[in-house]
Amino acid sequence: MRCLAFVRFPAPAGLAGDKLRAVLEEGVPRYKGIPGLHRKYFLGNSSFGAGVYEWESRATAQAFYNEQWRERLRTVYGAVPQVEYFDVHAMVDNDSGTMRIEV
């Protein structure tokens, strides 16, 4: 069963505009080609930064969020992220015109 991971951390002060773009230009390519990762969204507002990851399975997701990953986010964003896992029971993708039920 696929898994969504919701990763959240306090928004670093001053991370906007050109500085945010620079962080994303460095960070986004890291996620291309990771085995088991289908999609990743980089999110944020004035209070929090977040990521939504769609994984092949919960085990794949949990293996990815290791100490090295946590330390890198602590270095880049100044905080240890919180990770929550959600089982994907069904999905509708209007871009591709597909649906999937996994229960």
Regions found by a protein language model. Give the residues of each.
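Short S/T/G/P-rich N-terminal loop/turn motif that feeds into the first structured element of a domain
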Residues: 1-48, 58-67, 79-103
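A short, exposed loop/beta-hairpin motif centered on an aromatic-Gly-Thr core
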Residues: 52-54
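A common structural junction motif
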Residues: 71-75
